[in-house]
Regions:
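Short acidic-hydrophobic, aromatic-tinged amphipathic segments that line or gate anion-handling sites
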Residues: 11, 55-59, 156-167, 224
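Active-site/ligand-binding-proximal alpha/beta "capping" segment
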Residues: 177-232, 236
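Short, acidic/turn-prone active-site loops that include or flank metal/cofactor-
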Residues: 36, 61, 135-137, 208-209, ...
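RNA substrate-binding interface of SAM-dependent RNA methyltransferases
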Residues: 19, 26, 33, 93-185
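Short beta->alpha connector loops at strand-helix junctions that form conserved
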Residues: 59, 107, 133-134, 162, ...
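Structured adenosyl-cofactor binding patch, chiefly the S-adenosyl-L-methionine
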Residues: 18, 124, 144-149, 213-253
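Short, hinge-like loop/turn segments at secondary-structure boundaries
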Residues: 73-76, 147-151, 194-198
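N-terminal positively charged helical leader segments and presequences
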Residues: 1-93
């Protein structure tokens, strides 16, 4: 990749690119596709042609693999500017508090695929705001995160906090802080009793191996677990995130 394109991100995967083309075609600077995708993305090609942006039918899958660094391109690769994740501000938290918003907080989730899966679940259940930790252990947006999100990236807004601990301190008094912890006493089934229908809340999801940091855990107003049969200790964080998104959405129905 030359210097001109170093700050681009390759969005690949059929559903991810389809949602990007439908919701934010203006973000696409270049588009590459296999022959079997030409008819499906005809409108996008017309859009790009009108704006004198590059689109091209590739001759082999290897070209797409080289562009996105993955064999899982599903016949399409759209290049966009590297997304800017805005820093969280107190005014965002205050707005969520006044509007009774449900938010997710990712505390050092290290796997980009898990981040993408969490974003997909959030979009599915109508949770539009996700805060990620700015620490090195936190996964960032990658082609695989976009692909695994299956188009969900176009329906959420990401924010970055210095750490989960820093965010939870700022959120005190504005959002009910609920930590996902497999050692907690209370069950996810209690969320309707914990969160009011119009109450603003943040669900804290922790690192795949270590969970929520001890400092962040101490700042949670309540810790909640997903009870199982005991055969394994816990669910994958993306699976757990899906259940928590569902529980929070159910409260608001």
């Amino acid at each position: 990749m030359n210097e001109l394109h170093q700050k681009e991100l390759a969005v690949c995967g059929f559903e991810a690119v389809k949602a990007l083309a439908a919701q934010h075609p203006e973000k696409i600077s270049r588009f590459f596709f296999a022959g079997n995708r030409a008819r499906i993305f005809g409108d996008l090609c017309k859009y790009l042609a009108q704006r004198k942006r590059l689109y091209r039918l590739v001759q082999s899958d290897s070209e797409l693999e080289k562009l996105c660094g993955s064999i899982h391109h599903q016949g399409v690769v759209a290049m966009i500017d590297m997304p800017h994740i805005q820093d969280i501000q107190l005014q965002h938290i205050q707005k969520w508090g006044s509007e009774g918003t449900g938010v997710l907080l990712c505390d050092r989730i290290g796997n980009a695929n898990n981040l993408g899966a969490i974003i997909r679940s959030a979009a599915f259940f109508g949770i539009k705001d996700i805060v990620i930790s700015g620490e090195d252990a936190q996964a960032q947006l990658t082609p695989s995160a976009y692909r695994i999100a299956q188009g969900g990236m176009e329906f959420i807004t990401l924010y970055k906090a210095p750490s989960a601990e820093a965010f939870l301190k700022e959120a005190s008094g504005y959002l009910l802080r609920i930590g996902a912890d497999h050692r907690a006493y209370r069950s996810i089934a209690a969320i309707p009793a914990i969160v009011g229908k119009d109450e603003a809340a943040v669900i804290v999801l922790g690192n795949e191996e270590h969970g929520i940091t001890p400092a962040a855990k101490k700042l949670c107003d309540v810790l909640v677990k997903i009870p199982g049969c005991g055969a394994v200790e816990s669910l994958n964080v993306a699976q757990a995130g899906t259940l928590f998104c569902s529980a929070l959405a159910e409260v608001r129905r």
